[in-house]
Design a protein with these regions (language model features):
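Structured beta-strand-rich core segments of catalytic domains in phosphoester-bond hydrolases
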Residues: 36-106, 117
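N-terminal, active-site-proximal structural segment of metallo-dependent hydrolase catalytic domains
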Residues: 1-47, 52, 64, 174
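Active-site-proximal beta-strand elements of phosphoester/diester hydrolases
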Residues: 1-9, 94-107, 139
Length: 248
């Protein structure tokens, strides 16, 4: 299985890049975040042939999407979102024994308590999924740098949102309680430059002075089958890079 997660930062502005990414990578599963469009605003050309597609957005804010290749999962896919998702931030699908979710966690800058509540609900949902015996893959912009090294030294500031202890504790709690593994870190444990987001100024992206906030978290047995995980820093004009993960 090849899986891509990408905060596209506006699908209408980057529809050609999205089409190029799918055509080039031929992924089995695509998770998008921050599509910033309702289904009615998304042109038909963004429903690539050969994929089950679900756009879960409400206009110029937030929104997620999930695409599943017909050749990977031949049955009609049923997409859903959990009850705590009131801002178009989660879409999931059960692909046999694997539940895949595209998730966009609030940044927290405007309403930090709401971010913590969302993370708490996500942890509970993931815990319940794991308790039901399903493998779980959570992909997306989780807006938390899990470790200190997931923020470039030049970007670190005391007590900044995205690095606070309570945020990291919640995300670590999800990993522990749901039995999932940070695939990128598992495959490249000593790399301190696995960044996926860069502020759009001072050539920070070109200099790779960024944050690692986009993840693929997979149940341990599935994570053990992960072969590669790459942040495609050179691709596209979103402030986030696509993360491409392959499993055997």
């Amino acid at each position: 299985m090849k899986l891509i997660t990408w905060n596209v930062n506006g699908i209408r502005a980057r529809h050609a890049q999205f089409a190029d990414l799918v055509a080039t990578e031929q992924p089995d599963v695509v998770c998008l975040q921050e599509i910033k469009a309702s289904p009615e605003q998304i042109p038909e050309l963004l429903a690539p042939g050969g994929y089950w597609v679900y756009w879960h957005g409400a206009g110029g804010y937030s929104g997620v999407a999930l695409l599943v290749c017909h050749s990977y999962f031949t049955e009609q896919v049923t997409f859903f979102h959990p009850s705590f998702d009131i801002e178009n931030r989660v879409v999931a699908a059960d692909l046999g024994a694997i539940r895949v979710a595209s998730v966009y966690v609030p940044n927290g800058g405007k309403d930090y308590p709401a971010k913590l509540r969302f993370l708490e609900s996500l942890v509970q949902w993931a815990r319940e999924t794991a308790a039901g015996g399903q493998s779980l893959v959570i992909c997306g912009d989780l807006n938390v740098a899990l470790e200190e090294r997931d923020v470039h030294p030049k970007e670190r500031k005391p007590n900044q949102i995205g690095t606070r202890p309570e945020e990291r504790a919640l995300l670590n709690g999800l990993i522990a309680d749901a039995g999932v593994v940070d695939v990128g870190r598992r495959l490249d444990p000593d790399n301190n430059e696995l960044f996926t987001w860069w502020a759009p100024w001072r050539n920070l992206r070109q200099r790779n002075i960024g944050w690692r906030i986009d993840y693929v978290l997979a149940s341990a047995p599935l994570a053990e089958r992960a072969l590669t995980a790459q942040s495609r820093r050179e691709f596209g004009t979103s402030d986030h890079a696509p993360v491409v993960v392959t499993f055997s």
